[in-house]
Amino acid sequence: MKEKIGWIDNLRAVACLMVIMIHTTTWYVTNSKAVGEHTWDVSNLLNSASRVCVPLFFMISGFLFFGERSAQGRHFLRIVLCLAFYSLVGLAYITWLTPISEAISIKHLLQKPVFYHLWFFFAIIPIYMLSPLIQVKAVRAGYLAVVTLVLAVLANPNTIDQSVGPFHWLPLNLYLSGDSFYYVLYALFGRAIGMMNTDRRGISWLAGVVFFASVAGIAMGTKKQMAINGAFADTWYLYCGPVVFIAAVSLLVLFKNCLNRPLPVLTLISRNSLPIYGFHALFIHFMRTHHLDHTDQPFIDIPLVFVITLMGSLLLALGLRRIDKRHLVS
């Protein structure tokens, strides 16, 4: 069990870092006309490599709660308290440090998160609610491969339309709709892969190759789609998209096989990942909107914004943990 917790902690920490990287590079990928092509390519690559972060969070939750152990009342309480607490933090930030109307944020509180990154707390609630009903069985790798091919690729509503003349053949219509189905599927895969013996000869290399190929596919697909549309399009960035799904599965296998021992820095980030997630967007938004960044020097700006955001969020997280002795929101 310690081995399993080791790779889970490392994976959670890297997913947390990826979230920060996505929001750090978003300005560049959505403002292609304001940045050079080389800068946009690098930002797009970093963003593409980080798109698996949200799927990984769902997979981790599935691994933890879709087995013998299910989410308990204290887990539901913690999610609700986190949503309330970080919404209040976001509301305070909006009120005091932005011209955004807090009244609108309050009015739509149950339909739209106060701050954009808090949507995840809403999305994870159904996973927790379903967990007492689900206990994933051990399955073969071949079965998961078929499920991935059919549900995550061929019948995925986010798969780009393909036709031969008047004959439309992709995506298949299996009446799948909505992101929530794929969030549950990620959780199911997290548990299934977590129980599977994946440490076989060549599997880790294959997982690594598939992950890097998927990242390249996301990056190149995004650039091609931007050329077609004449503006940035997130078609290939979607968390429930087929290539992101494959990338997330391959990275999970890679971490499970190769990073199953505790690493001090990643352990620290993992332990504080919840408040880091809750605070990080405020740092990035403040720097971007108060001209404290250096977008004219992107290769200084990106690592600087990333490090300041990580360190600032980590310091707040450590401070919050000293106050929140029961770790209800930290």
Task: Label every PLM stretch briefly.
Residues 198-267, 272, 298-300:
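Alpha-helical transmembrane segments and terminal signal-anchor/GPI-anchor hydrophobic tails
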Residues 3-6, 24, 38-45, 71, ...:
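Juxtamembrane loop-transmembrane helix junctions in multi-pass integral membrane proteins
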Residues 57-59, 64-66, 93-195:
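Hydrophobic alpha-helical segments with transmembrane-like composition
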Residues 3-36, 59-62, 78-98, 123, ...:
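Kinked, hydrophobic transmembrane alpha-helices enriched for aromatic residues
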Residues 2-5, 66-77, 130-143, 192-206, ...:
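Membrane-interface helix-boundary motifs at transmembrane edges
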Residues 42-53, 107-123, 160-186, 219-249, ...:
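Interfacial loop-to-helix transition and helix-capping segments at the boundaries
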Residues 256-270, 281-330:
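C-terminal "closing" transmembrane helix and its immediate cytosolic amphipathic cap
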